[in-house]
Amino acid sequence: MTNIRKNHPLMKIINHSFIDLPAPSNISSWWNFGSLLGLCLTIQIVTGLFLAMHYTSDTTTAFSSVAHICRDVSYGWIIRYIHANGASMFFFCLFIHIGRGLYYGSFTLLDTWNIGIMLLIAVMATAFMGYVLPWGQMSFWGATVITNLLSAIPYIGTNLVEWVWGGFSVDKATLTRFFAFHFILPFIVAALVVIHLIFLHETGSNNPSGISLDSDKIPFHPYYSLKDLLGVVFLLATLSILVLFSPDLLGDPDNYTPANPLVTPPHIKPEWYFLFAYAILRSIPNKLGGVLALAMSILILALIPHLHTAKQRSMMFRPLSQCLFWVLVANLLTLTWIGGQPVENPFIIIGQTASILYFLTILILMPLTSLFENKLLKW
């Protein structure tokens, strides 16, 4: 058995990636979220495949087909709710995974980090298009508002929006192409995940101390495979509780009303995992400025390795940077809350303050604090 595992061309790849992989001996539970993201992606692809068997991407039947899945398909309701809430679990793990990378300095693995940013954008695009498919009120108006942002691009904006829509408004052509992209993108995400892992295994994982541990590595299996299994149990338990007890907790009631282009919902908002970016978009009165701020709120992650001024890689022994990191987390939670509130005072001014603080913390305060810590340590 050992010979097959170590010599067979396919088994050898699996062996070097998940069994005999040399892993740092001190990585904490914050490193569990990579494997949990893999589990989430698998759940989403499997449940999505079963949903696609019964879904019809036509404006006249899309809403009814989702109702049909929940009512008439055997266990269709649980498949639909696992898929919907699985997306929330996916983003929850994704945000923690990125946060861990920021805290412990994993962004210094440039190739892995940049592929990770591409993965984030691809997953966000997939989730956005998936939210449009049930063709409820929030699906239709969310699609209209977000795709309409492309019209802010000078010269080509209007043509670009009509090209994306496939007409002069969000209609049948839009829904059909969104379904096609929503189906294919998870497989592109899976391919990017493989590239992400290839780059990661070129350098090896980071660890909480941020220093090289080449002299003290342990095999991934059984140590971290069992440790990951505990995370899997917690994730599946949380997802099961969410699906079985309050499946609509994170959804919007407006999406149980069929899409109607003649009636605008009182408050258009995306799913909770996009609210921080939506709040940044809304906090700028100018349309083009808002779109640029929205794009930068995600793409700013690509600048972080170049803004790293600290002599230490990890924040483990940098208390001032730790404080700023948790300020950033609190700020993102504030933005998430503001994104779900109506556009009126005091929410407008809170959103604008939080948006400024978000960019200020990452672009100026964190690099300056790192330089100050270097001075304190006489480095």
From Swiss-Prot:
Q: Which pairs are disulfide-linked?
A: none
Record-linked CDD domains: cytochrome_b_C, Cytochrome_b_N
Offer a single GO CC term for the protein.
Answer: respiratory chain complex III
Keyword hit for Metal-binding:
yes
Q: Which Pfam families match?
A: Cytochrom_B_C, Cytochrome_B
The cofactor remark states: Binds 2 heme b groups non-covalently.
Protein name per Swiss-Prot or TrEMBL: Cytochrome b
